[in-house]
Every structure is written in structure tokens, then in C-alpha cells.
Swiss-Prot record:
Residues 111-143 form a coiled coil. One of its GO terms (cellular component) is cytosol. Fe cation binds at H180, D182, H237. Disruption phenotype: Impaired in the 1-aminocyclopropane-1-carboxylic acid (ACC)-mediated reversion of the ABA-induced inhibition of seed germination. It comes from Arabidopsis thaliana (Mouse-ear cress). The lineage of its organism: Eukaryota, Viridiplantae, Streptophyta, Embryophyta, Tracheophyta. This is 1-aminocyclopropane-1-carboxylate oxidase 2. 2-oxoglutarate binds at R247. It comes from the Eukaryota. Keywords: Coiled coil, Copper, Ethylene biosynthesis, Iron, Metal-binding, Oxidoreductase, Plant defense, Vitamin C.
Length: 320
């Protein structure tokens, strides 16, 4: 990272004191110019975070590692000779919290892990909604505006992608996760504080998102770019593989409900809206097949229903 480019870290405890204005300004600057920021003193118990980290890493060793190695062999990735651009070097499973939890349906998760993840998910849900209200305040929107938009008639969707990025013998040959923007609303990431790998694209350069103990990394999805009429941006990010260390990632996605109507907030449109209006589920159906392609054609396609098929969506993506 360049010396004059300091990744934004926000201490949420300062919102309650004399430094509130400066803290709100830091959040706004991060949303406008980075699409990412890291938060500390966020209210999540450190012992719960430690428990989630330990259980996630233990679960990988006991339940996921062999499956990952089998996948490598089945796809011929156990002996990389040429660069691979259509597969990610990651082991994942998904937890859905809202509208209805699937935790009890995940058979290889222990009861203790299930209980901890349920607690963690609820706390992250509340944190996500608090953060959305902070964005509303910075944007001059009424408190609760973003939460109301996300709600639709069925409530928001909220889920967690639990990932491990094992050591890769040839990191130059394959990405842990290919570059993309996130389709949804606001993302809260609890990442490994020892093994790095997450990068975002800023001003043409890939910038490391620094591992920081007990922090939560926040990034904005495509829906917030649309609602803010481009004032805030979703940003390309990726995970690079490492030769040493198994990187843990617990990413929780607070997204609009399937029938939520997404459009630029009227107060943020000065002349003509730069972004389309659509139903969130329609956007997700498009995104599923073009996740690793630029976002701009997706926005353009949503303005013209006939153009959606031209992007040829084929792949599946977890929408929780």
C-alpha cells in the first residue's frame, strides 16, 4: 500500500463522544472513495469472535479439508501447470439467517458451533442495521430509510458465507476468489487476523485489506451504489492465494428481500437518475451468471429487460 494511502479504520466507540463528527466524516469518506472500511469497538464480544474463529477452523479440518482436496483432484488442480481463471481456490459453506434459518439443516456442524453462529448472526444483523442508519445520516436520508427499502414485503435476506482459503503451492496460477463486486447491500466480514489475502481495487492498484484482530471489515454492495445514485460505490475485490497459512473468512451479507424495489433515493437525484429501478430478485438472477464480469453492463441491462439475456447468465450464486 502506498505511504499516503491509509486504509480507513473506524472506531465506533467514538460515535458516543466529542469525536462523533470526525468519525461520521471518516465513514462517509470511506464509502465515497473506498467502498470499504474496517471497524473496531463494534460491540461484538471478543470471546464470541474467538469461539467462531476456532470452531470455523476446526470444522474445516474435520469436515471440509478432505472434500477440498478431493475437489482439487477431480478438477485437476492438485498439480497446477497453467493459470486457471474459472475456478476459485476456496472451501465454503453457507448459513442462511433470514428470512428463515437453515442452521439446523447443516448436518456436519456441531450443536455448539450452531449455537455460536446463531448468536453471532443475530448480533451482526443488528450491527448491519445500525451501520445502515449511519449511512442514512451521512446521506441526509431519514433514519431507517435503507432498512425500509431492503425490507420489501418479506423482510431482508441475511446470510453468512463461511470460507477457508488453504495454502496454495502456486499462488500465481489461481486466485482464492476472483475479482468481483458484491451484488447485495452491506457486507460484514470477520477475517483471519494472521493470514492475509483480501485485496480491493483502488485507483488502478490492488490494495491489501489489512488483517486486524477482532475487527470487522465492511464493504458496500451494488444495491447501495444504486440507491445512493452513485454517491457510494461497490468496489472490485478479490482474494489472492498464499503459499503458507489457511485463511479464514466469515462474510455476512445483509441484503434486500427478494421482492424489494430498488431505485435511487429521490433526494439523491439532482437531474436524471444514473441508475435503473428494479426488483432485487431480478438483479440476482442476472448476477448469478455474470458475477465475475463488470457491474456496469449489469446496471445497463436492468434498464432494458431484453438486454438481460444478452449477458447470458448461466452460473449459480448463493443468494441466501
Amino acid at each position: 500500500m502506498e505511504k499516503n494511502m491509509k486504509f480507513p479504520v473506524v472506531d465506533l466507540s467514538k460515535l458516543n463522544g466529542e469525536e462523533r463528527d470526525q468519525t461520521m466524516a471518516l465513514i462517509n469518506e470511506a464509502c465515497e472513495n473506498w467502498g470499504f472500511f474496517e471497524i473496531v469497538n463494534h460491540g461484538l464480544p471478543h470471546d464470541l469472535m474467538d469461539k467462531i474463529e476456532k470452531m470455523t477452523k476446526d470444522h474445516y479440518k474435520t469436515c471440509q479439508e478432505q472434500k477440498f482436496n478431493d475437489m482439487l483432484k477431480s478438477k485437476g488442480l492438485d498439480n497446477l501447470e497453467t493459470e486457471v481463471e474459472d475456478v476459485d481456490w476456496e472451501s465454503t459453506f453457507y448459513v442462511r439467517h433470514l428470512p428463515q434459518s437453515n442452521l439446523n439443516d447443516i448436518s456436519d456442524v456441531s450443536d455448539e458451533y450452531r449455537t455460536a453462529m446463531k448468536d453471532f448472526g443475530k448480533r451482526l444483523e443488528n450491527l448491519a442495521e445500525d451501520l445502515l442508519d449511519l449511512l442514512c445520516e451521512n446521506l441526509g436520508l431519514e433514519k431507517g430509510y435503507l432498512k425500509k427499502v431492503f425490507h420489501g414485503t418479506k423482510g431482508p435476506t441475511f446470510g453468512t458465507k463461511v470460507s477457508n482459503y488453504p495454502p496454495c503451492p502456486k499462488p500465481e496460477m489461481i486466485k482464492g476468489l476472483r475479482a468481483h463486486t458484491d451484488a447485495g447491500g452491506i457486507i460484514l466480514l470477520f477475517q483471519d487476523d494472521k493470514v492475509s489475502g483480501l485485496q480491493l481495487l483502488k485507483d488502478g492498484d490492488w490494495i491489501d485489506v489489512p488483517p486486524l484482530n477482532h475487527s470487522i471489515v465492511i464493504n458496500l454492495g451494488d444495491q447501495l451504489e444504486v440507491i445512493t445514485n452513485g454517491k457510494y460505490k461497490s468496489v472490485l475485490h478479490r482474494v489472492v492465494t498464499q503459499q503458507e497459512g489457511n485463511r479464514m473468512s466469515v462474510a455476512s451479507f445483509y441484503n434486500p428481500g427478494s421482492d424489494a424495489e430498488i431505485s435511487p433515493a429521490t433526494s439523491l437525484v439532482e437531474k436524471d437518475s444514473e441508475y435503473p429501478s428494479f426488483v432485487f430478485d431480478d438483479y440476482m438472477k442476472l448476477y448469478a451468471g455474470v458475477k465475475f464480469q463488470p457491474k456496469e453492463p449489469r446496471f445497463a441491462a436492468m434498464k432494458n429487460a431484453s438486454a438481460v439475456t444478452e449477458l447470458n447468465p448461466t452460473a449459480a450464486v448463493e443468494t441466501f
